[in-house]
Amino acid sequence: MSSHHQILQIRSDPFVLSHCCRHTRLTSSLTLQSPLKQPFSCLPFRWRRSYRGGVRSSTTETHGSKKEALVSETATTSIELKRVYPFHEIEPKWQRYWEDNRIFRTPDDVDTSKPKFYVLDMFPYPSGAGLHVGHPLGYTATDILARLRRMQGYNVLHPMGWDAFGLPAEQYAIETGTHPKTTTLKNIDRFRLQLKSLGFSYDWDRELSTTEPDYYKWTQWIFLQLYKKGLAYQAEVPVNWCPALGTVLANEEVVDGVSERGGHPVIRKPMRQWMLKITAYADRLLEDLDELEWPESIKEMQRNWIGRSEGAELNFSILDGEGRETDKEITVYTTRPDTLFGATYMVVAPEHQLLSYFVTAEQKQQVEEYKDFASRKSDLERTELQKDKTGVFTGCYAKNPANGDAIPIWVADYVLASYGTGAIMAVPAHDTRDNEFALKYNIPIKWVVRNEANSSDDAKQVYPGLGIIENSSTLETGLDINQLSSKEAALKVIEWAERTGNGKKKVNYKLRDWLFARQRYWGEPIPILILDESGETIAISESELPLTLPELNDFTPTGTGEPPLSKAVSWVNTVDPSTGKPAKRETSTMPQWAGSCWYYLRFMDPKNPEALVDKEKEKYWSPVDVYVGGAEHAVLHLLYSRFWHKVLYDIGVVSTKEPFKCVINQGIILGEVQYTAWKDQEGNYVSADTEERLNEHQQVTIPEEKVIKSGDHFVLKEDPSIRLIPRVYKMSKSRGNVVNPDDVVLEYGADSLRLYEMFMGPFRDSKTWNTSGIEGVHRFLARTWRLVIGLPQSDGSFKDGTLVTDDEPTLEQLRTLHKCIAKVTEEIESTRFNTGISGMMEFVNAAYKWNNQPRGIIEPFVLLLSPYAPHMAEELWSRLGHPNSLAYESFPKANPDYLKNTTIVLPVQINGKTRGTIEVEEGCSEDDAFVLASQDDKLRKYLDGQSIKKRIYVPGKILNVILDRTNVKVTTK
C-alpha cells in the first residue's frame, strides 16, 4: 500500500450504485461527480483515481504482471461508453460463426444414452410490428437454460417456429389487398432476423410454421382422429358473431360488445358450428393437474376454468295463467340444494329454449328487446361480478317443488345458456348476485341458513356460507330439513328429489365444449365433406391430406354468414370418392389455437412425411421439460394442448399423459414511467394533490429529466410544489411507448439487452422498462471485458490477447470463483436469473482487487458468463487461446472445499492500542478488513472524522490504523 496520506472514505463501486438505482434515476439522492465529461462511474476501473481539483494522481495501477500506461485524459474523455468494448464487431461475428457451423443443431439421431432437455418457448405470432423488448424476456430465459444444459452434457432440443395463421393477417389482407401468405412470410423473415440478432441458440433446422401444408397436414390428421372418436361434431350454439369481420369470435376477443381488433359490433346469435368434445376429458384434465410441476396459480386457474362441482338438478313445473301446473318443466342445476326452500324466484338465460313457450303476451316485447340487448355482450361481460344486474320479468311463474310456492320467472343475462341448464333457482338470502337482483326488483328474500357465528345484528345480511338450516319444512311435500347442517340437508334434498321424481344428483362443469370453427380464410381447412343430398358429413381420406387452401384474392366477408372459402366455387364443389355423390367441402376453417395445440411434438421430428412424429423420437424427447410463455395463455392454450395430447395418448401416438413437465410464466415488461402534470386555463401547473377536479385541466407529459423525487412523491424539478402522477402502461403502439430491441442492440449490444432483461427483477414478476437502466449492465460487461483484455489503445481499439497469467490461483481467488460458480448455477436452475447476475458482478468487483488474473480463475468465469452474454464469452474464450466454440464446454462445478465459510476474529488497533475486534473471512484483504472495521459500531467512534496516515495489516493476525491528527477531518458516515 502506498505510504502517502489517504483521505478516509467508505467507497461503493459506482457500478453497484447504478445497479441499486437501476429502476429509476430518481430513487437516490446520491450524485456521482467528476471533472471529466463522462460520469466517474462510467470510466474504466483503472482510470479511477483520487482527483484533487480535477488533477489526476500520477500513480499507476498494477494489473496482472504488467504495468499499463494510462491513456491521456483527452483520449479518455473522447471514448464513449458504448465503445468501451467492441460489441459491434463481436456480436455479428459470432452469430455468423454459429450459423455457418450449425453449432446449435440437434442431430436427428441423438445419443439416447445421454440425458435430454427439451426447453420450449410459446412460439410467437409473427405480426407486422415485429418484436418489442417484452418478447426477448422469455426467449432469453429459455436460451440461458438451453446453454447451461448443453454445457452440462445434455442433448438439448431448443427450437423456434411461427404460429402464423389467424385473423390479423386476414384483416390486413382485406385492408391492403396483400395476400396473407405474402404478409406472413415477410413478417416471419423479420422476426427471424431479430431473434438471430439477439444470439438465441435455436436449432433453426427445425423451424416450422403452422401455415405450411406439410405442417397443417398433421393438424388436419389430428382432427380426423377426433372425428372418428366422436369428439368432433356439429351443433347449433350461440356464438359471438361479428358481421364486419365476418367471423365468430372467442369470448376473449370481445371487449365491451365490440371486437378487440377493429372495435366492430359483436352480437350473440345461434349458428351451426364444429365443436370438440373437450368435456369428455374434463375429469382427466382436472385430476392430472396434481402430477404437474406447474405454479399452483396456473393449476388453480385451470381448475377454476374446468369448474367441477357436485350438486343436484331440480325440476320446477311451469304454471299457467291460472296457477295450475303444466306439462313443461324448467330444470335447474344447483350446488346448494340445501337452500331450496329459500328460492323465491327463477332466472333463465335469454337464449333458454323454453323462453318463447312461457313468456306472456304482455311481456313479450320487453323480453325480445332484452334478448337483443343481451346478444351484444360476451359471456365474460355478462358474468362480471361488478356489473349492474339487469333483467325482465317474463310474466310467468313456476312451482318451487319443496314448498309449492309460486315463484316468478325472470330472464337475465347473468345466467348463461352454456352453463348448467341455462336456468337457476335464485336464493337472494344466500347468494350475492341473487341478492343484488332481488333488492333492485323488490323480490322477496327468505333466510333458510343460519350462521351460528354471526351476531343477531347480522342475521338479515346475505350469507353465502354453510350453516344450520331453518325455515325449511312443509307438510305439503313432507320434506323437513330444519336443524340439519348444510351438508346433511343437501344429501336429504337429493334423496327426496330422486325418490319423488323432482330431480337427481349431478356433477357439473363450467368447462364447455370447444367451438372449433371460424368463418375466415386464413386458417387450416377442415377436412370434411358435406353430401348435397342428405347433409351428412364425411371425413376425407387421410391419403388426401393435406387439404390445402385454394388461392383467393377476395377475402372480404360475404355478408351472408358464409365464410370467404365459399367464394372458391371450384374448390368447394366436389364428389365423395367412396360413393360418387356430389358434395361440398366444409368452408369454415380451424381456429388459431389448432396449430399451436401440438407443435411441440412436431419439433421432435419436423421433416417426417409419414407420421406426425416418430415413436422412438417422441418417447425420448417427451415431455417438454420447460415451457415458457405469457400468463395470458395459462388457461386456454394449455388446456387445449393437454386435451389433444390426451387424445393422442389414447390412440398411441404419444407416450406420456401430459405434454409439459414444467410451465413458467414470465412477467410483463411495462413501458417506461410516464409523468403526468396538469395545467389550468392560464397555463399554470396544478399540483395533483391539491386539486380534486384534475379532469377539467389539460394533461401534459413531463420528461424524466425535469422530474425529481421528493419523499414518496414525484415533483417538478423547477417547482417542487407541483406534484406529478407517475404511471406505467403495457407497451402498445397507440401509447407510443414501444421500445424496439433493434434500437437497443444497435446502441448497447445484444448481450447488454439480454443481461438487462434478466437483471430487471424476478423473472416471473412484471417490471418497468428503463432505458437508462441498461447502462448499468453495459458497464458491467465493459468492466468484464477490460478485466480480461485490458485497456483500449488511444484510438479506442483493443490489442489482441489477454491479461491472463499462468500463475497458480490463491486460496482467496479460488474461494471467490467457486462461490460464484455455486451461486450462478443454483440461480439459473431456479430461474432466479437476476441474482445470478449479481453473483457475477460480485466476482468482477473482487477480481479487480487482485494483483493478477490467473487462467484457472478467468476461464471458468467466462464459461459462467456464457449463458447470459454468449457473444462476449465466445470472444473472450477465443482470445484465451481456444479454437472452438465454448457452447459444448463443460460448465464449471463448484468445489465444496472452497465454499466453506472459514472466519476468524481479527484484533483492530488504533495507534497501536487494541480498540476492538472484527470477524473476517480467512484470506480477507487489507481493504476489506479496513472497510469492516470502519463500519463496526465500537470502532467507528475512533475513526469517524479522522485522517489516515497509514495502515499496518498482518493477514489473519492484526489490523493497526495509524491516524494523522494534523490532517483535514473527513467523516466516514
Swiss-Prot record:
GO biological process: embryo development ending in seed dormancy; leucyl-tRNA aminoacylation
EC class of the enzyme, as a word: ligase
Short motif 'KMSKS' region, span: 730-734
Subcellular location: Plastid, Chloroplast; Mitochondrion
Family statement drawn from the similarity comment of this UniProt entry: Belongs to the class-I aminoacyl-tRNA synthetase family.
Name the record gives this protein: Leucine--tRNA ligase, chloroplastic/mitochondrial
GO CC term (a single one): chloroplast stroma
Recorded superkingdom: Eukaryota
Species, as recorded: Arabidopsis thaliana
EC number: 6.1.1.4
Described purpose of this protein according to its UniProt entry: Catalyzes the specific attachment of an amino acid to its cognate tRNA in a two step reaction: the amino acid (AA) is first activated by ATP to form AA-AMP and then transferred to the acceptor end of the tRNA.
Binding site for ATP: K733
Gene3D superfamilies xref list: HUPs, Isoleucyl-tRNA Synthetase, Domain 1
Description of the deletion phenotype: Embryo defective. Developmental arrest of the embryo at the globular stage.
